């Protein structure tokens, strides 16, 4: 079955097929709820499902517009006249669209996802540098002592401020690494793309460590201050 609806990547018959949402039949340009991968065509990833280019530095508004357009066009109410099977298929496609949208909402999510598509995991392959491990040990000591030592609490506050500053710097580093990876995709360059994944892994891995430290330090500091014991 086919149903037409508005989508920013499908407004024109000249729109590249790869930039049409996957639920659009590549031959007719119309929504096809029975769509299956064509011969030699891979299963769609999040980018393909939303009809967006496989890039990390995507415009947030473009992601939202693609999601809203697809969810509106795939709303089950539009397919009631075609029977329960069509409604069920629309619901299934809507679920995939929602999953894709949730998986691509932030720059960090998109960076992690392109690593996943390449069969990589930032957490598994990341090896923290000695300087970061030293900070982890220092933070662990301060966290352990913050509940009963006012001086350790002051130290932990300083460490937390430092971790937050590091996190901001890592966000900028990730944007640079993402730009390098995106540049390797047009035209597609497998070697350059593989090389560009290394900085993504490093930044994401370090960000996870710093996020963990921020969370633990914040939790420790939310406990009562030993300098002002409860009566």
Which positions does each model-derived feature cover?
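C-terminal accessory/regulatory regions appended to core domains
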Residues: 1-231
């Amino acid at each position: 079955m086919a149903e037409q609806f508005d989508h920013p990547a499908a407004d024109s018959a000249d729109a590249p097929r790869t930039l049409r949402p996957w639920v659009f039949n590549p031959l007719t340009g119309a929504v096809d709820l029975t769509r299956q991968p064509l011969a030699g065509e891979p299963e769609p990833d999040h980018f393909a499902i939303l009809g967006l280019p496989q890039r990390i530095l995507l415009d947030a508004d473009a992601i939202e517009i693609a999601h809203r357009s697809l969810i509106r066009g795939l709303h089950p109410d539009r397919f009631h006249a075609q029977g329960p099977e069509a409604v069920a298929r629309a619901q299934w496609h809507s679920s995939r669209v929602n999953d894709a949208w949730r998986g691509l909402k932030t720059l960090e999510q998109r960076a992690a996802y392109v690593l996943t598509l390449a069969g990589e995991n930032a957490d598994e392959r990341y090896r923290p540098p000695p300087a970061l491990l030293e900070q982890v040990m220092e933070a662990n000591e301060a966290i352990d002592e913050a509940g009963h030592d006012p001086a350790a609490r002051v130290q932990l506050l300083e460490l937390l401020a430092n971790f937050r500053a590091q996190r901001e710097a890592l966000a900028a580093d990730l944007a640079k690494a993402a730009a390098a990876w995106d540049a390797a995709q047009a035209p597609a360059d497998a070697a350059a793309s593989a090389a560009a994944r290394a900085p993504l892994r490093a930044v994401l891995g370090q960000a996870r460590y710093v996020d963990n430290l921020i969370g633990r330090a914040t939790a420790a500091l939310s406990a009562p201050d030993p300098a002002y014991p409860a009566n």
